[in-house]
Amino acid sequence: MKSSQFAVRSVMLGPVTAATTARTANLDTQGAKYATIEVVLGAQLNTNATAPTISISESDTTVATTFATFNSSFSTSQANVAATVGAYHVDLKGRKRYLRLTLTPDTTTNGAVLSSVVGILDKEIRAANSGNADTVVVG
């Protein structure tokens, strides 16, 4: 049997300039082996701004109160003095079905930042070979 990978991309948070308001999005990881969450941030508008905070949590349902942090490395700030992309890689083995990203910009009006988030799920597909293919007889 031959195995290969293919990626499914989802826009979790569309591009928006926001200040003071946290944005959240869920990623359904059913059937995936690995997830990458890319957080794209525009440059800070001024030097008084602080870096946005990013956290990733997990749950078996999409009920907001059931999500829990599973790795403290996924609760961090991402510096955006210049435009930047942060990638967060998650091995889904043993993880719950849903990942939730929370992006919190500067909590003052100084920190409006353009942001967007893309989730990429790597799924395994199995190609046919002589060991698992049906026999086709022509003629």
Regions found by a protein language model. Give the residues of each.
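Surface-exposed, low-hydrophobicity beta-strand/loop segments enriched in small/polar/acidic residues
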Residues: 1-139
